[in-house]
Amino acid sequence: MPRIIGGIQTRTSGRKSVANAAQSRPPTPAPAPTLARSVERVRIDEGAEGQRLDNFLLGHWKGVPKTHVYRVIRSGEVRINRGRAAADTRLAIGDELRLPPVRRAPSIDPDAAPAPPREFPVVWEDDALIAIDKPAGVAVHGGSGVAFGVIEQLRRARPEAHFLELVHRLDRETSGLLLVAKKRSALVALQDQFRRRETGKTYAALVEGVWPKTTKVIDLALHKTLDAAGERHVRVVDADHAEGRRSISLVRLVQAWPDYTLLDVTIKTGRTHQIRVHLAHLGHPVAGDPKYGDFERNRALARGKSVAGQRFGRMFLHARRLRFEHPANGEVIELEAPLPAECGALIAALDANTSARVQR
């Protein structure tokens, strides 16, 4: 069974990272739509094999209203191998699509620079997928006030790639393993594994306080809401809550200090903010969590006043282990990403401070 542990390793990638740029831009009014000038011809490759025609066009025609896409298909203007096609037609390798001119809405800010190309540390790569070690503070995709994220930057860094799509997501503040599919078949197979809970995802989390050794399973329902600005908020609700979703986290105590505990948390369900809300609800929020944590303690930690001699300005949540079946051959793959340097430095400072206390 392939097993990548410890340092970052790469199968096929030797690219270098490009300097990061600002992640967000203020929104501006959208300009008028523009009309494509001529008929477009597209030949289907492995990246789109098996995809429905309507779904392919919705992705290919960025900025075209969904209703217009279906209207064009129904009119017969979209042709596959010179013949009319229905919206649910499955595409095959070698199919030639004839696409009529369509009116597209340009980007929200026409003067905004495109996402700067950027490579990320690669833990695993082959013809089907890429596993990267995402840094904290980087969104996985653009939206909600974020101009771009990992996927937009990766596409810019690899213009030769015909297909790059996120298999799953990580919170912006969370670092660690993130899968990107290089083929649609791989995307479908991997997302199916995630839906059926056949993957193993373990996170390293430093929490405030001393975690009780007897608490090893957290089984609490969660309810997600969106505020007027579109920001997500998650809270624990009763098991019989009409809109609550059962959420299970398995907890293993790794190391404890007087004021903090390092945990390994394996999620059996993949709810939004699951680990963060579960731990905070039990009185042990993730260190540095800006949404569910303690603001004053976060500020003290960032200023080096919580752990003497060590400033820590991020959330300590790291997706460190990921286990799944390879979409091409069913082989079990287990990947690990070591703790980022800043997290390791905080652990070392906690050890040093505890030793100093004992000596006194």
Segments the model singles out, each with a brief description of its role:
Residues 1-360:
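RNA pseudouridine synthases
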